[in-house]
Swiss-Prot record:
It comes from Salmonella agona (strain SL483). Belongs to the ThiG family. The lineage of its organism: Bacteria, Pseudomonadati, Pseudomonadota, Gammaproteobacteria, Enterobacterales. Homotetramer. Forms heterodimers with either ThiH or ThiS. SUPFAM superfamilies: ThiG-like. This is Thiazole synthase. It catalyses: [ThiS sulfur-carrier protein]-C-terminal-Gly-aminoethanethioate + 2-iminoacetate + 1-deoxy-D-xylulose 5-phosphate = [ThiS sulfur-carrier protein]-C-terminal Gly-Gly + 2-[(2R,5Z)-2-carboxy-4-methylthiazol-5(2H)-ylidene]ethyl phosphate + 2 H2O + H(+). One of its GO terms (molecular function) is thiazole synthase activity. Its EC number is 2.8.1.10. It comes from the Bacteria. The keyword Cytoplasm applies. Catalyzes the rearrangement of 1-deoxy-D-xylulose 5-phosphate (DXP) to produce the thiazole phosphate moiety of thiamine. Sulfur is provided by the thiocarboxylate moiety of the carrier protein ThiS. In vitro, sulfur can be provided by H(2)S.
Length: 256
């Protein structure tokens, strides 16, 4: 069970809505993933009507919506997008995204912290997408963010946990949930993140661009479940030396 702010989730896998070939395929994949929290970009949704091709199927599926501010380049733009989303969707939950460079899509740490502090004061439940910077993540926690979402690698890159060393520090020091977001390319990456101690992962591109998104979503669901179970089981310590699983000489002595 995962708790963030006032909500609890059975699944530790969050999903996105971009890059799917159709809305029907998107919903089928989300259902196969078991995800209960789904993020969607405000720039891709018609907020004036709930029969939008992306929004309507999600509402019907009964998932918790997490609008994001993707496309915002400044704190001011992100705050404006957040206010529009709250008014249109009736939710104060928000994935805060500010990335001014369209090529790399790396989050702006200064603008993100500035916007996060303002949005928390306005009553938003803020989940900020940020770099894997332990100092920044701690500052975001201190201003009241409900979780932090450090990247594993650049958005859509499928590179995996390239920031593993920093993620481990963030997980160790955080008192709010840590959701590894961006760069997760295959199910084993998700398993690794959960084994490390992350509370959840957010996956979009890896599922949406697969030849069979529904099958890939199922694979991610199982991978996340495996990661959670492995962490709860408490793995053995890593050792430099070999350690025999059975006696090496005792049986020979018994036969002598």
């Amino acid at each position: 069970m995962l708790r963030i702010a006032d909500k609890t989730f059975d699944s530790h896998l969050f999903t996105g809505t971009g890059k799917f070939a159709s809305s029907q395929l998107m919903v089928e994949a989300i259902r196969a993933s078991g995800s209960q929290l789904v993020t969607l970009a405000m720039k891709r949704v018609d907020l004036r009507q709930h029969n939008d091709a992306i929004l309507a199927p999600l509402i019907e599926a009964g998932v918790t919506l997490l609008p994001n501010t993707s496309g915002a380049k400044t704190a001011e733009e992100a705050i404006f997008a957040a206010q529009l989303a709250r008014e249109a969707l009736g939710t104060n939950w928000l994935k805060l995204e500010i990335h001014p460079d369209a090529r790399w899509l790396l989050p702006d740490p200064i603008e993100t912290l500035k916007a996060a502090e303002a949005l928390v004061k306005q009553g938003f439940v803020v989940l900020p997408y940020c770099g894997a910077d332990p100092v920044l993540c701690k500052r975001l926690e201190e201003v009241g963010c409900a979780a932090v979402m450090p990247l594993g690698a650049p958005i859509g890159s499928n590179q995996g946990l390239e920031t593993k060393a920093m993620l481990e520090i963030i997980i160790q020091q955080s008192t709010v949930p840590v959701v590894v977001d961006a760069g997760i390319g295959v199910p084993s990456h998700a398993t690794q993140a959960l084994e490390m101690g992350a509370d959840a992962v957010l996956v979009n591109t890896a599922i949406a661009v697969a030849d069979d998104p529904v099958m890939m979503a199922t694979a991610f669901r199982l991978a996340v479940e495996a990661g959670v179970l492995a962490r709860q089981a408490v793995p053995g310590n890593r050792s430099t030396y070999a350690s025999a699983t059975s006696p090496l000489t005792g049986f020979l002595e018994a036969l002598a």
